[in-house]
């Protein structure tokens, strides 16, 4: 029951009305019996500093940060974890003993969660897209000891920047989506990860299209694991297509839940968080 003593955790971004985080986080908080609630708060760019400073003064125990503030929030934090610095993005904060914001990023741990039980050491991978999500995916693939990463994108400038950030850590190459070499790479890939928004229910993209078009996927075969970070609709057009090819498929729901569970553990100083409760809450909602 919410009382005058109840504290809160907030999601800050713009927009936030589509977020599923309140569903899964409040299910976990209720299960754990904590006097906390989780709310979503829309926040414009020009209000970010004011909102962040104001939340220090009231009963806010932690924050999730989403688009478009994941990079802008750096200047408002007193402590930043190595992984957040590496990714140049923050998604989780809590107030430290000095009433200042300590920050981290839980996206990498979220991404690798459904892959941990698979033997992927020294395997070959393809990442589709070169935006912010691709950074977390590439770092996760490095942590899982993949041998090579090929990043395919439409945007040469963001692709070049992404490759430059990781080229000293792993064998990585960037290709534009119309490069003829992609056909062979897809045929040989052990894992393909889609970080583009193509197929997402709430985007302007047509629902039944595949990232980079049907021809791009003609060499896909059943030995490849296909992981789509999109979780709505379930399954996505890409995962429907891949399942028909006999591929193992993974959607983005487990990543969403796992990164959320890691955030909740961060806010509660290492409390064991019920993944299954959060996952079931989202499945029931969707």
Swiss-Prot record:
NADP(+) binds at residues 129-133, 229, 252. It comes from Prochlorococcus marinus (strain MIT 9312). It catalyses: shikimate + NADP(+) = 3-dehydroshikimate + NADPH + H(+). Its EC number is 1.1.1.25. Shikimate binds at residues 19-21, 66, 91, 107, 231. One of its GO terms (biological process) is amino acid biosynthetic process. Keywords: Amino-acid biosynthesis, Aromatic amino acid biosynthesis, NADP, Oxidoreductase. InterPro entries: Aminoacid_DH-like_N_sf (IPR046346), NAD(P)-bd_dom_sf (IPR036291), SDH_C (IPR041121), Shikimate_DH (IPR011342), Shikimate_DH-bd_N (IPR013708), Shikimate_DH_fam (IPR022893), Shikm_DH/Glu-tRNA_Rdtase (IPR006151). Involved in the biosynthesis of the chorismate, which leads to the biosynthesis of aromatic amino acids. Catalyzes the reversible NADPH linked reduction of 3-dehydroshikimate (DHSA) to yield shikimate (SA). Disulfide bonds: none annotated. This is Shikimate dehydrogenase (NADP(+)). One of its GO terms (cellular component) is cytosol. The lineage of its organism: Bacteria, Bacillati, Cyanobacteriota, Cyanophyceae, Synechococcales. Belongs to the shikimate dehydrogenase family. The keyword Cytoplasm does not apply.
């Amino acid at each position: 029951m919410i009382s005058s003593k109840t504290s809160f955790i907030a999601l800050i971004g713009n927009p936030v009305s589509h977020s599923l985080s309140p569903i899964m986080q409040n299910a976990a908080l209720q299960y754990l019996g904590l006097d906390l609630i989780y709310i979503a708060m829309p926040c414009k760019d020009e209000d970010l500093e004011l909102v962040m400073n104001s939340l220090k003064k009231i009963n806010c125990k932690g924050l999730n940060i989403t688009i478009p503030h994941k990079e802008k929030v750096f200047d408002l934090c007193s402590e930043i974890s190595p992984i957040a610095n590496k990714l140049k993005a923050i998604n989780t904060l809590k107030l430290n003993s000095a009433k200042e914001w300590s920050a981290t990023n839980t996206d990498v741990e979220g991404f690798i969660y459904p892959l941990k039980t698979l033997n992927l050491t020294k395997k070959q991978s393809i990442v589709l897209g070169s935006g912010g999500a691709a950074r977390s995916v590439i770092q996760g693939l490095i942590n899982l000891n993949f041998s090579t990463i090929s990043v395919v994108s439409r945007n040469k400038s963001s692709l070049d920047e992404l490759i430059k950030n990781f080229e000293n850590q792993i064998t990585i190459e960037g290709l534009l989506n119309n490069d003829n070499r992609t056909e062979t790479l897809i045929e040989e890939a052990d894992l393909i990860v889609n970080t583009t928004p193509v197929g997402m229910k709430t985007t302007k993209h047509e629902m039944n299209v595949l990232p980079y078009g049907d021809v791009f996927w003609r060499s896909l075969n059943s030995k490849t694991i296909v992981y789509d970070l999109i979780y709505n609709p379930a399954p996505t057009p890409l995962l429907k297509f891949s399942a028909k090819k006999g591929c193992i498929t993974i959607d983005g729901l487990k990543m969403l839940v796992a990164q959320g569970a890691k955030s909740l553990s961060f806010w509660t100083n290492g409390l064991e968080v019920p993944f299954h409760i959060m996952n079931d809450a989202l499945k029931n909602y969707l």
